[in-house]
Amino acid sequence: MKTVVNSWNEWDPLKHVIVGRADDCHIPPEEPALDAKVPEDSDMRGQWGRRPQETIDRANELLDNFASLLEKRGIRVDRPTPIDFSKPATTPDFHTDSQFGCMPPRDVLLTVGSEILEATMSYRCRWFEYLCYRPLMEKYWEEDPNFRHEAAPKPRLTDRDYRADYLSEKIGIEKRLKWTAEKFFVTTEEEPLFDAADVLRFGKDLVVQHGFTTNQRGIEWLRRHFPDHRVHAVNFPGDPYPIHIDATFTPIRPGLILNNPQRRLPGEQREIFYKNDWEIIDAAQPAHNTPPPLCYSSVWLSMNVLVLDPKTVCVEKSEVYQAEQMDKLGMEVVEVELRDAYAFGGGLHCCTADVYRESSMEDYFSTLSG
């Protein structure tokens, strides 16, 4: 299959995708951005180092099976090249004793049209993660003359990028919710920061979550970088750990979005969707009461689905309520076992990154042009 980089939204027919790997994945050491994400009662507090080999093997088995399933449906699948994540991440501004992994390419790579943009990232342990994808980027650049490989300015990630008061006391859930409602996050506005997984693509419009991993300067950088797009900042006050939008707000097809019922989009931010005949409905409840062991993510990875086309969606096999909801919405559900890989970086949307969808830059919000 000839390489063509082209993807403008989250739902048009998927023809080429990157699926991550779990090789050598580490629980990184404590650092400012990471500590604020890990709840006080989490089993990950105080733990760091290489994940147990049997869990790595199991995660890779599931990721390989997912890749094979996609290939059997006629979708080209590429995989990253893991680096040695046991090595420290060191720059003139910071040092952390190990890195993370390359299971979730969605965090690092943002595909907009014929461009793949490497995000800044906001964790020190993930500063060099882009290297896992460089062999693929080089290959695409050679094979597709229209492909644009871009990288956002690498942040310094000094202590000035983080609020020390996020870590200075044992912070209860009520205080966290108050802070996030006030858009008071662990990251400051020292320099532009964004993770690619905070961005959803709606043709001419990009919806970007302001939270722990993406700040306002990062959103403004995206606005200037994509001058032909409209960039909309959103936030979800019900989320005490707002990191990455794709377990909170999930477009399924033109006109339909699932919203996490515990993290509803504020009323004034819904107007652009309602005025353009988009329906926002509550996602089904997760099938699990707790996340898997040693997992950063919440139980709401249930709604972290991968849409293959406007009528077909991949849902994690154990998430029976989400699958039932998708079925009632008229979607063909493809069950994919992945829960034992969640701890390595997320769900079905997280562990993939688009290369090619049969799509174009359509205007889905024409009543609010400009």
What residues fall within each predicted segment?
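The feature marks the mature, well-folded catalytic cores of soluble enzymes
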Residues: 1-370
